[in-house]
């Protein structure tokens, strides 16, 4: 009984509420915290997507290389439509059908194809067919231009054949699927009918093989090795300007500060590591251990020679990746090229970059040596941007 009375006394002696200022503010001070309005909050910077993040930033950005990619985008519809229409019967297409081919023709999804067609009145025209449907095709002026392009293809056939031979000589098994050559034909200036018209004319150079273990894929195989072709652009340049080639690439040796090397000593040390380079036509190159220095030299040489064989001395990521098996390339090709800024310039975004051979371009951003096909393309682009033919243009 005394225990119960004692417990009751203790309970009554405690206050129901603690009105101590200290305890009150320590337990319920949340109302004093002022909420910062959203517009004044420091925004966390979002990580930029590789799809939009540019490879180069100031001061390394070279505007004339970046502008070339803008030109590619500007004439995307023209180039894709030209290639697609050229393969159609009578080189015409019904407008209703064209509206469903945004990927093949290169116009934005959800947009009217007619709007893109009307941008190039000297190149493309629409007309109402006897079926009362609107069709479009090339203008008579464009037909004449295409005949000129065919002449270029015939005149340069020998050079294009040598380009393909060199690509085959660089490849690991001296074989390249015909589909890959076709997908990249514009890169090297190969005609549309290269497989069916050109290849059969050169049985002493090429052989078409059906690879059963690869779903019957048709592959172009090298018949004979030609030592006169197995000379890279770098090797030719070395004979003209040895010092320039020595400076083209850099494979630095890691060393501690204890060596106390000055700039000249470090340059000489790095040169020992950089030279000799490995020829892209080395038959042992594809067999090198992937992660050795010699293998990286070989892959850098492969990319350099690959670009030197292209019309514009440049290639997009999808062009290079398509040949990764043939040229023993790794997933680190992007990082490898970034390490060689003296020779290569990577333009565009991290997801869709284009690599240029810097020495092939002048300070004005123009190719120093232009292939006739490149000259034709530039003329076509000028006509494509005209609304009517100007007098004396092109004379």
Place the predicted regions along the sequence by residue:
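General structural concept
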Residues: 78-132
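Short acidic, hydrophobic short linear motifs in intrinsically disordered regions
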Residues: 79-80, 88-103, 136, 172-187, ...
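C-terminal structured domains
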Residues: 264-300, 305-395
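Positively charged, polyanion-binding regions of nucleic-acid-associated proteins
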Residues: 72-90, 155-173, 285-311
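Short amphipathic alpha-helical interaction segments
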Residues: 107-118, 189-200, 329-339
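Long all-alpha helical scaffold domains
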Residues: 147-285
């Amino acid at each position: 009984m005394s225990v119960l009375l004692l417990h009751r006394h203790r309970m009554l002696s405690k206050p129901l509420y603690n009105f101590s200022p200290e305890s009150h503010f320590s337990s319920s001070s949340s109302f004093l915290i002022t909420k910062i309005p959203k517009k004044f909050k420091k925004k966390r910077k979002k990580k930029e997507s590789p799809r939009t993040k540019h490879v180069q930033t100031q001061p390394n950005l070279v505007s004339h290389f970046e502008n070339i990619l803008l030109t590619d985008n500007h004439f995307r519809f023209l180039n894709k439509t030209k290639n697609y229409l050229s393969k159609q019967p009578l080189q015409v297409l019904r407008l209703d059908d064209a509206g469903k081919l945004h990927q093949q023709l290169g116009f934005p999804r959800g947009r009217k194809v007619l709007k893109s067609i009307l941008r190039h009145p000297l190149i493309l025209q629409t007309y109402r067919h006897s079926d009362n449907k609107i069709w479009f095709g090339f203008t008579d002026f464009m037909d004449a231009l295409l005949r000129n392009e065919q002449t270029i293809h015939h005149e340069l056939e020998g050079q294009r054949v040598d380009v393909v031979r060199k690509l085959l000589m660089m490849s690991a098994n001296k074989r390249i699927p015909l589909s890959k050559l076709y997908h990249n034909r514009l890169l090297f200036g190969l005609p549309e009918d290269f497989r069916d018209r050109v290849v059969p004319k050169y049985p002493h150079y090429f052989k078409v093989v059906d690879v059963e273990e690869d779903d019957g894929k048709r592959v172009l195989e090298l018949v004979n090795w030609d030592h006169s072709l197995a000379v890279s652009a770098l090797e030719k340049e070395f004979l003209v300007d040895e010092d320039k080639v020595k400076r083209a690439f850099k494979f630095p040796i890691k060393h501690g500060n204890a060596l106390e090397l000055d700039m000249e000593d470090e340059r000489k040390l790095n040169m020992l590591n950089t030279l000799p380079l490995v020829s892209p036509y080395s038959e042992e190159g594809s067999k090198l251990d992937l992660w050795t220095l010699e293998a990286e030299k070989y892959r850098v040489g492969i990319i350099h020679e690959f670009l030197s064989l292209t019309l514009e001395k440049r290639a997009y990521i999808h062009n290079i990746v398509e040949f990764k098996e043939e040229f023993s390339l790794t997933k680190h090709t992007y990082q490898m090229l970034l390490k060689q800024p003296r020779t290569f310039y990577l333009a565009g975004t991290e997801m869709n970059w284009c690599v240029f051979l810097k020495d092939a371009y002048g300070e004005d951003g123009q190719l120093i040596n232009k292939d006739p096909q490149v000259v034709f393309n530039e003329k076509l682009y000028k006509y494509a941007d005209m609304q009517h033919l100007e007098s004396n243009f092109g004379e």
